[in-house]
Amino acid sequence: MITDTSADFMDLLPEVPQPQKGPVFTYSTPEMPWLRRTLIRTVERLSGRAGFERLYRNWQQKPHNAEDSIFTQAIGELGLTADISPEEMGRIPETGPLLVVSNHPYGIIDGLFIGHLMASVRKDVKLICHSLLCQPQEAQDALLPIDFGAGPEARRTSAETRRKAVEWLDEGHVLIIFPGGGVATSVTPMARNASDFEWHPFIARLARRPGVKTLAIYVAGRNSRIFQVASHLSYALRVALIFFETKRKMNKPVTVRVAEPVECATMGKGDVVAWLRARTYAMAEPGGPEADYVFNFPPRINV
């Protein structure tokens, strides 16, 4: 005689992914002071975050082409198109360890778009990005989180990502990183161009590894004047506007320049970062940002 229990029966059922609680996309965290958290969520809500949540939920219900990367699916949902020459697209190596470095003019769009370009050529792509953008379950295999928090858990997360990044390259894959670590910003609120923060020296460790080729990419453009002014007033207001800036760029082309891949293994550690930054900004449009311009938050800004 066969006996059965409800527990045994439940064990036979296929696992069903549970919906994530709370907003999937937000730059706020429960650990933030109440005022900062409230400001970020309020501005995000007013500037389009809910639309991205709906876009994501609707996308989850659609059938997907298994051959398309998460990056390609995302830019399809956002209506982004590529403005890049076939010659420069052909510079992406099809095999071997590849470090991709780029300026960071927009925020979310930059990572998705460069991820899409790389995934159009090869499938072994990972992107280092802000940990708060790693919430969608479907994207987690393609992302390596950097936690910008100040606590020990944040430091552990970032240290683990650095270890995995080195390992990923050593295994012969593609790693995308924005060495500035934050969205490009005008040096003064009304300046014409937006520049990256100082590039992080960690990329020298990656670029100088034996056999690694480094591909410099320049993404043209900048965020709105509203974002630039906000960045000189409040860090919380700045990050809260990222979804507004992403919405502004939807259904538009993204202009990208790609340099020839290079090997940096024989370069001095102190030279690599500045050289790669200069190589990236050398592809800027006439009158565009220059490598020597570096944005830093005013002392009054509490990051």
What are these regions (language model features)?
Residues M89-P93, Q135, T188-P189:
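A short beta-turn/loop motif at secondary-structure boundaries
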Residues T81-G90, C129-L133, R162-A165:
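Short, charged beta->alpha transition segments
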Residues L98, K123-K126, A142, A165, ...:
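Generic beta-strand structural signal
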Residues I2-S6, S158-V303:
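Non-catalytic C-terminal accessory region of glycerolipid acyltransferases
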Residues I75-L80, H104, G151-R156, R192-A194:
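Short, flexible loop segments at the rims of nucleotide/cofactor-binding pockets, characterized by
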Residues A50-R54, L99-A154:
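Catalytic core of membrane glycerolipid acyltransferases/transacylases, capturing the structured
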Residues Q73, F113-H116, S120, E167, ...:
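Residue-level signal for well-ordered alpha-helical scaffold segments within enzymatic catalytic domains
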Residues I2-V101, G111-F113, S120-D124, K249, ...:
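Membrane-anchoring hydrophobic helices of lipid-metabolizing enzymes
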